[in-house]
């Protein structure tokens, strides 16, 4: 294990992050398994293999307490593939965000949000896996540097922290963009309940589910800048009642009076 106190603290923080992400992944494991099983894309298909290799290397390190050149060679090339996986998932989330931004028809918000609700678990799972795997590689890298170049340990630790923050910031920005569009769509369909009594409540329910998923992910990765909250829209009865009240108020306004038929119209 690392001998420098600073290095040990950094490693412990990364290992704690890995543990929390692992717990999160267990909760959405079925969705991610479906993606890996059905996806023919080469980028996605690499995920399981890379994860297995990194887990094996971490196990060896924990058993032996050191990182040999052979052990390090197993994972030294993984960061490039991990970065590709993260970029792929972010691109998918951006695609969903752009679809939400383009859709202006309130009636189409329900199928759109249903699609996002079905897909978001998979892309969040990929992002969580990418962060977890990179944290594991960083633990191994710190151990390797401590063995081979202990005088460089502090600089490596700072570099790893900065790189991790940059990756999380990119993820955070993509999720905030999606959240902003969902909030806008919630406001739009929330005001259309009277005209769309079926699709609007279902769209709101979809958006609330997506918001819950995004917040759970943000909490796991401690992305403090994601504050996604969707208020419940009015029910049809509430919307209808408000419409009646508004009409009544308009009729009671000064200068407004009920229409009375003229004598001519009565005679007819």
At which residue positions do the language-model features occur?
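Amphipathic, membrane-active segments
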Residues: 7, 11-69
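Detector for methionine-enriched segments
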Residues: 1, 9-12, 53, 58, ...
